[in-house]
């Protein structure tokens, strides 16, 4: 019996809520980092909708990050290989 009462209260609260759209100025101040409202201002945000068409994203940043990671991995691998080579007296 108490659970139905609680659901009724929740439903009443939901009904009393009003849907308000945030003005565009407030959107731009870091509220939504995942995409930009105009891609000219934030041209290199990851997954920014590009001007080349609907559903396409700019991936320059991702590529750059991947290259950096690969560089770090190869450096670590080289370091370990040099250590192993020294221990085996090649």
From Swiss-Prot:
GO cellular component: cytoplasm; nucleus
Chief place where the protein resides: nucleus
UniProt subcellular location: Nucleus
Region (Disordered), start-end ranges: 46-65
Keywords: Cell cycle, Cell division, Mitosis, Nucleus, Phosphoprotein
An annotated GO BP: gastrulation
Modified residues (Phosphothreonine): 22, 48
Domain of life: Eukaryota
Gene knockout outcome: Most embryos display premature mitosis resulting in defective invagination of the mesoderm during gastrulation. A small percentage of embryos also display an extra nuclear division prior to cellularization.
Example of a GO MF term: cyclin binding
Subunit structure: Component of the Frs-CycA-Cdk1 complex composed of Z600, CycA and Cdk1. Interacts preferentially with CycA (via C-terminus) but is also able to interact (via C-terminus) with CycE (via C-terminus).
Stated role: Cell cycle regulator that is involved in modulating and adjusting cell proliferation according to the requirements of the developmental program. Interacts with mitotic Cdk1-cyclin complexes to inhibit mitotic entry at the G2/M transition. Likely to function by binding to the hydrophobic patch of cyclins to interfere with the interaction between the complex and certain Cdk1 substrates. At the mid-blastula transition, involved in the cell cycle arrest in G2 of cycle 14 by delaying mitosis and thus reducing cell proliferation allowing cell fate specification and morphogenesis to take place.
Protein name: Protein Z600
